[in-house]
Amino acid sequence: MTGFSNKAIVIDGRGHLLGRLAAVIAKVLLEGNKVVVVRCEQINISGNFFRNKLKFMSFLRKRCNVNPARGPFHFRAPSKILWKTVRGMIPHKTERGKSALRRLRAYDGCPPPYDNRRRVVVPAALRVFCLKPGRKYCHVGRLSHEVGWKYRDVVRKLENKRKVKSVKLMAYEKKLKRITKESGEKVAKTTAPFTAVIQSYGYN
């Protein structure tokens, strides 16, 4: 993930631990890369749900007594929770930190055009690698829903639609590969001399 690239790294948030994923993203952003995180509602937090909800409710009580509109601002959406976690790991008040944070995009669900893009995972932040089997964890989506996020059902509905569409696309691509392979086998004898010439130039 090192080096500069105009193309964004698309990360699938499903099954990652919030803090560990945010730490990796912060480092990558400061190196100059663009990062897009999809399916933020399926990011995990270690510890049982009740404990995490109590911590979040305690955070909701933190406000300015004189004028609460001054902040701190309590984001409920999973994508904004991830964004704020990453912000805490970046020197966001400096110009370098501001530009790094501008390179981050986080989404609930998997909107176009990222539904057709290749998505990657971060092994160092995956729950199955970081937590012992049997340890308790909860989903950011459930926590957000319980503290005021209103779009869980909408995101679920759109995700189900996307998955059905994805299965159909996979079946079509599989069929297309099979037809292409069969067509190649049919004309293999006819095209053998031409194939030999092409391979002599180093192409396969």
UniProtKB/Swiss-Prot annotation:
GO terms for cellular component: cytosolic large ribosomal subunit. CDD domains: Ribosomal_L13 (cd00392). GO terms for biological process: negative regulation of translation; translation. Gene3D superfamilies: 6.10.250.3250, Ribosomal protein L13 (3.90.1180.10). One of its GO terms (molecular function) is mRNA binding. Keywords: Ribonucleoprotein, Ribosomal protein. Transmembrane segments: none annotated. InterPro entries: Ribosomal_uL13, Ribosomal_uL13_CS, Ribosomal_uL13_euk/arc, Ribosomal_uL13_sf. It comes from the Eukaryota. Belongs to the universal ribosomal protein uL13 family. HAMAP family: Ribosomal_uL13 (MF_01366). This is Large ribosomal subunit protein uL13. It comes from Spodoptera frugiperda.
